[in-house]
């Protein structure tokens, strides 16, 4: 039986390694070498998705509806171009992986049809061919509903999908809310019953899902040895997968970081250092909806959102851990250097739930939402050079 690591308890003090104020000043004043600033996306969007194929960046969905846009990074001054609209229903939190020169869009949260009255966890898959500018829905369904799922590829030919909510529980919550109608007492009962549960009782997905587009088949990549998460950041480093934070139940995030290495047909997992707090002695509440990537072998993580105080309430025995707390969008950027996290700098503004795209040794951050959920069209480039973080 696989041992599951239950990281419930959090220490209320965390060692933090801070760069000097002078270093931070230098970091923000110098763009990295040979950088060309990428233009903002034509529309502000959040909860969208995207990927890179060759020298083109693609983003769409979320609050952008069915729209998708493409940027040729070799001709960035020409700006973003609109491509064919997504043929499926509008959705948020879909994930996209570029495989063999095509985009594959998985799941999300939305309606099954235009006439549907309820959002639900979706399991459909769409393919986009840049050569023909055409979309098609594939004759397959993911083995799980894909909301809050993290996705990447380690070989460019197969997609790896991890985490995400339990479809039955997630869909059931919205069904029960709809059934309550205008009865506030009944609605409150539904909300309290949903949030007042232990992390394991949400049955977040622990299966590693592998999709092979050549065969249009799903396979098992084993199970993770820790609680399933939703909204984790994900990136790849030297052929290994890095899974960063995410929520272990609604409103409660984990600071854990895991590394997955391919071993046969499955992934072998090793825990990396937990993400540190943004200030000396501060608790790291964990992040959901953060941005992540790798630059010159340094893992970079920035932004995200959480509920400060949620771990304190949870450790005091309150399962509804974020009750009465205010959601906070985060600004710090962290770097994993020599297997140790440090606070490397800050984003231009608090930001979460956008798109991270790896572009060689740059990490491109596109869109997302700022404080109080306001969508942005901003594009920011991160890189690590000379022991410093650079933003453009």
From Swiss-Prot:
Subcellular location field = Periplasm
Job of this protein? Converts alpha-N-acetylneuranimic acid (Neu5Ac) to the beta-anomer, accelerating the equilibrium between the alpha- and beta-anomers. Probably facilitates sialidase-negative bacteria to compete successfully for limited amounts of extracellular Neu5Ac, which is likely taken up in the beta-anomer. In addition, the rapid removal of sialic acid from solution might be advantageous to the bacterium to damp down host responses.
PANTHER family linked to this entry:
KELCH-LIKE PROTEIN 33, LD33804P
Name the EC number(s).
Answer: 5.1.3.24
Enzyme active site: 247
What's in the keyword line of the UniProt record? Carbohydrate metabolism, Isomerase, Kelch repeat, Periplasm, Repeat, Signal
Q: Which family does it belong to?
A: Belongs to the NanM family.
GO MF:
racemase and epimerase activity, acting on carbohydrates and derivatives
Identification of the protein by name: N-acetylneuraminate epimerase
Catalyzed reactions per annotation: N-acetyl-alpha-neuraminate = N-acetyl-beta-neuraminate
Start-end of the Kelch repeats? Answer: 56-100, 102-155, 157-192, 193-238, 241-290, 312-361, 363-392
Which is one Gene Ontology cellular component term of this protein?
Answer: periplasmic space
Gene3D superfamilies, sorted = Kelch-type beta propeller (2.120.10.80)
Write down the InterPro entries for this protein, in alphabetical order: Kelch-typ_b-propeller, Kelch_1, NANM, NanM_proteobact
Q: How does it assemble?
A: Homodimer.
Q: Where is the signal peptide?
A: 1-35
Q: Name its species.
A: Yersinia enterocolitica serotype O:8 / biotype 1B (strain NCTC 13174 / 8081)
Q: Which domain of life is it from?
A: Bacteria
Class of the enzyme per the UniProt entry, highest EC level: isomerase
Coiled-coil regions, chain positions: none
What are the leading ranks of the lineage?
Answer: Bacteria, Pseudomonadati, Pseudomonadota, Gammaproteobacteria, Enterobacterales
């Amino acid at each position: 039986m696989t041992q599951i690591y239950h990281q419930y308890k959090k220490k209320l003090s965390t060692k933090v390694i801070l760069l000097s104020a002078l270093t931070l000043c230098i970091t923000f004043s110098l763009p990295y070498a040979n950088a060309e600033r990428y233009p903002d996306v034509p529309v502000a969007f959040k909860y969208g998705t995207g990927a890179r194929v060759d020298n083109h960046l693609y983003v769409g969905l979320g609050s952008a509806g069915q729209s998708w846009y493409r940027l040729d990074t070799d001709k960035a001054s020409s700006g973003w171009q609109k491509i064919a609209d997504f043929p499926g229903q509008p959705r948020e939190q879909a994930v996209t992986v570029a495989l063999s020169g095509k985009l594959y869009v998985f799941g999300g949260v939305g309606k099954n049809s235009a006439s549907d009255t309820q959002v639900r966890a979706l399991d459909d898959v769409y393919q986009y061919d840049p050569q023909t500018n055409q979309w098609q829905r594939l004759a397959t369904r993911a083995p799980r509903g894909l909301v809050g799922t993290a996705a990447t590829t380690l070989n460019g030919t197969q997609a790896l999908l991890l985490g995400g909510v339990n479809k039955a529980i997630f869909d059931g919550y919205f069904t029960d809310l709809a059934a309550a109608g205008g009865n506030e007492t009944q609605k409150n009962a539904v909300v309290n019953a949903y949030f007042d549960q232990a992390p394991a009782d949400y049955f977040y997905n622990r299966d590693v899902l592998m999709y092979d587009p050549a065969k249009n088949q799903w396979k098992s990549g084993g199970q993770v040895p820790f609680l399933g998460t939703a909204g984790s950041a994900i990136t790849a480093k030297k052929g290994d997968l890095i899974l960063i934070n995410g929520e272990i139940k609604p409103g409660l995030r984990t600071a854990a970081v895991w590394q997955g290495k391919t071993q046969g047909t499955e992934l072998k997992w090793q825990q990396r250092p937990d993400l540190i707090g943004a200030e000396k002695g501060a608790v790291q509440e964990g992040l959901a909806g953060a941005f992540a990537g790798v630059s010159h072998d340094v893992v970079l993580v920035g932004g995200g959102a959480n509920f400060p105080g949620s771990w304190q309430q949870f450790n005091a025995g309150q399962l509804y851990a974020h009750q009465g707390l205010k959601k906070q969008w985060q600004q710090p950027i962290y770097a994993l250097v020599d297997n140790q996290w440090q606070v490397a700098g800050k984003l231009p503004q608090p930001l979460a739930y956008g798109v991270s795209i790896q572009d060689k040794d740059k990490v491109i951050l596109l869109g997302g939402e700022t404080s109080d959920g306001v969508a942005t069209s901003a594009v920011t480039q991160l890189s690590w050079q000379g022991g410093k973080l650079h933003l453009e």
